[in-house]
Amino acid sequence: MKTVCVGMSGGVDSSVSALLLKEQDYRVVGIYMKNWSRDLPGMKCPWAEDLADAKRVAVKLGIDFEVWDFEEEYRQKVVEYMLAEFKKGNTPNPDVMCNQEIKFKLFYERAMERGADFIATGHYARAVSLARAFATTGANARPLGRELPKANEASPITMGASKEASESDIVLARAKDENKDQTYFSIGFLMKRWRAQFFPLAT
């Protein structure tokens, strides 16, 4: 059985992602990424409540659940970056940096070290195989997005593209729900990681 580590924040999107993957016969492991726990002046960090929500969902779904502490890495890669950009008079985008350095880098690396086959998040985006991206012609031509395959299929890429295919065969594409599309916040990490990434909410 293929194993998927799902980043679970305690919110609806990541919870539904875990449910969809379980329904497709994957061994799902819920992962709460503890990135920040400090209260700021006038602002309480709700990490404990988020963690409790994620745990409750994992229990309800009957899946394993773990907490991975990325606080130090988050401080170095995201917070310090943000403060440095402000000092330069620039407008930083900590969400993009968090995805690039934490959710799609450290999370991916830790999951692979743990022995997972894939990772998944609740982002609204698609990983598209260019090998079959344009399956139709003429007025009906449109890219095909990744769908959730059964757990015994060899690759997470729709229409049979293999893991051994060229990294350039995989590109990031907008989610079908363009009102919720998050591809802008998901840019910036190595294409090879798309091969092990599920976006269950893509469609």
Regions found by a protein language model. Name each.
Residues 1-133, 137, 143, 149-188, ...:
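ATP-dependent adenylation/nucleotidyltransferase module used to activate substrates
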Residues 192:
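Conserved catalytic cysteine-centered active-site region
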Residues 195:
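Short, glycine-/aromatic-enriched active-site segment of Class I SAM-dependent methyltransferases
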